[in-house]
Amino acid sequence: MNVILAGKDNAKYLKNNTEVNTPYKKIFQDFIDIEIPNHGNFEGYPNRNSMQYIDLYNLKDVRSLKRGTLRHKGFCKAWNAIINSGLTKTSKNNTEYNRNLTYFDFFNQNIKAKSKEDLKKILDEKYDIKSDSIEYKNLEWSGLFSDKKVNGSLFESNNEILLDILKDKWTTDKNDIDLIVMYHSIIYEINKKERKIISYLNIEGDDNIYTAMSKTVGLPIAILIEEI
């Protein structure tokens, strides 16, 4: 559910001494390309409120500060289409309208394409998603163009229906492994000379039990407990 709600909150960050406020409908348009050695390129988008870290880390003289999230290539444009189609809304739906909806009907409820071929044209014109692009393939793979039925009467909001659709594909099988990557870019001055430090972290899971997420969350706590 966290990734669905990530498209619900606005984002704030500092850029050249100016506070930038990105509304949630534009968050996934505001992404940059970031290369992680040995793992390729990722898309980075602003994540919620970066301004809170200025006081937390005593960075009162900092001119730019942005905290973000990295996703695989092709994620941001696809998720931007999902958000701006109203699929992450938490407001209550009309139960009768949603009864026996197909996955395609659900995705298309606000796009209002006349057919799946018409949808390809609209996605291209409105969201810059070509029918042969990785973004289109991501949407298709997730099941959003399927004729499978979802009983909308079981859910109260679009985000609940979306979660029910995505959970079939967005799970790890026995032999799947997850990946966590981190990227820090720090630009600073010493003796009026600008310098830059870039650091990377990448951790792979072993399987769908001993995941990269469990390592990064569990190991620091385990080390702390041992030290105490």
What is the predicted role of each segment?
Residues 1-228:
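C-terminal catalytic/substrate-binding lobe primarily of soluble NAD(P)-dependent oxidoreductases
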